[in-house]
Amino acid sequence: EDTGGQPMTEVVREINTDYDGQLESIKASVSYDVLEMSGSRAVWKEVLAVYAVKTTTDPDDPQEVASMDDGKKALLKEIFWTMNIIGSRTESKTETVIEESDDGHGNIVETETTVTQTYLYITVTHKTADEMAEQYGFSADQRKQLAELLTDENNSLWTAVLYGITGSDGQIVAVALSQVGNVGGQPYWSWYGFNSRVEWCACFVSWCANECGYIEAGIIPKYAGCVNGVAWFKERGLWQDNAYEPRPGDIIFFDWDDENGQDGLSNHTGIVEKVENGRVYTIEGNSGDSVRQRDYPLGYYEVLGFATPAY
């Protein structure tokens, strides 16, 4: 509950945006040929649980957590950045690549070429709530309070506080939002069954659906290709074109206007978070190789359409 100041949902989104900005500034600060990202962030409920215990039990200045002011916001940001560490390094690699060309007589000629490429590695690591309790020197009572806040019984509370979501129909949105900031997609494509990185936007949607039990229930398919996902929903009459105003939990499919132009086939997918002031807000995997919140105008031309799962 918020009794004054900035709502918690806004502060969380602001910090998520700062985090995305840090990733983008690292990419912009160095010239590279290949980008490899890996790692995962601390989940927001752990960040907020540490913040709640630290705020309410501070022996020098105990405060309630229902309202957010500049001082509390600064503390929350400090805890977030203590729990989440972004590291980066570059490495030059000399590799042999085989190039194919036509000799002009219909014959394919293979030529070995040595190429030196700069790799940019970005890694995200995080501290757990228990590690933060150790770092802050929490007492036994504070640790007990922290553990109680993090029990599964409080998951619906965290969903409401963090994302403003109440009720079971927002379950997949809450799961997707809990993954914002994860990079490289390894948990999602490896869960799907791939041994190495693939374009993982659909794997992410499938993973979120699986966490909610929706794949087993036949509500959302397990799909790694966007075209297959569109076909599954269309066959079941669960499809709307881009003139539709989506609801939270709908699946959005894109047809990017890239160098090859649009072909009426989907090549990217995500989960609808909400619609507000004529814009659709989404959570997307493999957006710049990260899980990110994005937003677009309703009816945006690169949106192919929406799947409407029968939750």
Where are the model-predicted features located?
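Membrane-proximal envelope biogenesis segments
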Residues: 1-170, 174
